[in-house]
């Protein structure tokens, strides 16, 4: 499926336009009634078209050292996933540092740098060896987390959506098509700095579950569709940020992602 087909297919999935957005990361609203909702989109590198976001899936504890620091045993048990709303996207253009609002209700706000896969095909029960055929391209992203709320809900045996799924909780750079990258990223440095100090420093090859395996596992629980994106997990040494901090994220082969906590 080419990029134009991707957008045409996804247009049927959501109300509102999928291209020509007024604001980066948010679609221009063509709503004629109060009940129509604008489509969230992300710029595509090398194209004037934009990637329409249907769902945001995230995998938890997909690097062994991070699993340990979160109190888990990093064995190859089936992975677990959670979701963020599509409008949690905050698009950040390469070469810029975007203002990112410190959220309400938290006193322990954490960064998590991640590789993001964007799908242009979907299905159910997708075999791992066929899963990468679903991937349109990749981006660098942040899974921002209200850690105190996440842990508090976990301690109470309650869903911790409030710690993960909130406004602006998914900063992301542009989508780089596979044709531009030349290959699916499976190794290479992934790091994050806060105010110039390295906090996270790992390699994509250290993922417990590869992107292909994540797609396969997800497709057993959900019917995946064009427009889905998958945050593929973060390395160890997650930690807090406060207002005024500047976060710089890097993945080899992709432009850095920068935000300032405001």
Where are these regions (language model features)?
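Extended, compositionally biased flexible segments
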Residues: 29-130
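Structural motif
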Residues: 55-57, 79-81, 114-116, 137-139, ...
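A residue-level signal for conserved active-site and pocket-lining positions in enzyme catalytic cores
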Residues: 60, 117, 143, 172, ...
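A generic structural signal for short beta-strands and their flanking turns/coil linkers
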Residues: 76-78, 85, 111-115, 134-140, ...
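Short beta-strand-to-turn element immediately C-terminal to the catalytic PLP-Schiff-base lysine
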Residues: 83, 118-120, 141, 178, ...
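Hydrophobic, well-structured mid-protein blocks that either form specific transmembrane helices
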Residues: 125-162
């Amino acid at each position: 499926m080419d990029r134009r087909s991707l957008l045409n297919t996804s247009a049927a999935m959501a109300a509102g336009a999928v291209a020509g957005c007024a604001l980066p990361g948010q679609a221009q609203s063509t709503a004629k009634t109060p009940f129509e909702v604008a489509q969230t989109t992300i710029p595509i590198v090398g194209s004037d078209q934009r990637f329409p976001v249907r769902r945001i899936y995230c995998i938890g504890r997909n690097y062994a050292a991070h699993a340990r620091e979160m109190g888990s045993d990093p064995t190859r048990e089936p992975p677990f996933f959670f979701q963020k709303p599509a409008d949690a996207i905050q698009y950040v253009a390469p070469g810029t540092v975007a203002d990112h609002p410190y959220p309400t209700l938290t006193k322990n706000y954490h960064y998590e740098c991640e590789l993001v896969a964007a799908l242009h095909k979907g299905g159910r029960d997708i075999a791992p060896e066929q899963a990468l055929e679903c991937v349109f391209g990749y981006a660098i992203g942040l899974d921002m987390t209200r850690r105190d709320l996440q842990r508090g809900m976990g301690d109470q045996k309650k869903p911790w959506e409030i710690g993960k799924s909130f406004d602006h909780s998914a900063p992301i750079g542009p989508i780089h098509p596979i044709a531009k990258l030349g290959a699916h990223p499976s190794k290479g440095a992934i790091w994050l700095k806060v105010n110039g100090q390295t906090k996270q420093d790992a390699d994509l090859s250290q993922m417990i579950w590869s992107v292909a395996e994540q797609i396969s596992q997800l497709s057993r629980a959900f019917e995946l569709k064009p427009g889905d994106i998958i945050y593929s997990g973060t390395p160890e040494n997650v930690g807090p940020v406060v207002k005024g901090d500047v976060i710089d994220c890097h993945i080899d082969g992709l432009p850095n992602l920068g935000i300032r906590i405001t």
